[in-house]
């Protein structure tokens, strides 16, 4: 499989700026106090790619919640960049459900409440590691089709199902985020 470089701005030690996670100043948090202001992520253009897809995962979260935490799932990216705050501003992309959604396991939510939770959580949710600094993995997929047949809300597994046999190259990048300190 062909690979390509993914870029995200970090400090000299590989840490993402605080404004993109739970340690952000209040102005970068949503009205519920959650970090939904996404960083700029770019990558090398891939010859033959008609679109791209992206996932941002925290595998260190397994120590906290027993599973990897999905921070961002994005499909139908037309170019090789997601600008800063694309999660809130870029209407060309389709975003999947992050791990803050409710109702997966033994839930008191009915189906319509689950659907609402899934739609509300189809955005970037920034890092908030509670037990120390965490490593985060961005994977970008170059695809040979212009659009994936995705409909909101969709999950990471749905993205992978639709990308099957359409991935022509993959790019990866890791970064760190400092432990979340509640203010």
Give residue spans per PLM region.
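N-terminus-centered regions that define maturation/targeting leaders and the start
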Residues: 1-183
């Amino acid at each position: 499989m062909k690979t390509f470089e993914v870029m995200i701005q970090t400090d000299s030690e590989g840490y993402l700026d605080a404004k993109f996670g739970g340690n952000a100043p209040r102005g970068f948090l949503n009205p519920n106090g959650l970090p939904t202001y996404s960083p700029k992520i770019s990558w090398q253009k891939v010859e033959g790619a008609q679109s791209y897809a992206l996932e941002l995962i925290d595998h260190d979260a397994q120590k906290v919640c027993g599973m990897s935490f999905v921070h961002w799932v994005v499909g139908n990216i037309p170019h090789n960049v997601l600008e800063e705050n694309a999660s809130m501003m870029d209407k060309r992309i389709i975003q999947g459900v992050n791990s803050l959604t409710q109702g997966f396991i033994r839930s008191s939510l009915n189906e319509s409440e689950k659907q609402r939770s899934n739609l509300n959580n189809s955005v970037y949710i920034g890092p908030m590691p509670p037990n120390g600094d965490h490593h985060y993995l961005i994977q970008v997929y170059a695809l040979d089709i212009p659009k994936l047949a995705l409909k909101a809300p969709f999950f990471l597994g749905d993205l992978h199902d639709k990308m099957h046999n359409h991935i022509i190259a993959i790019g990866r990048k890791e970064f760190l985020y400092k432990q979340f300190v509640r203010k």
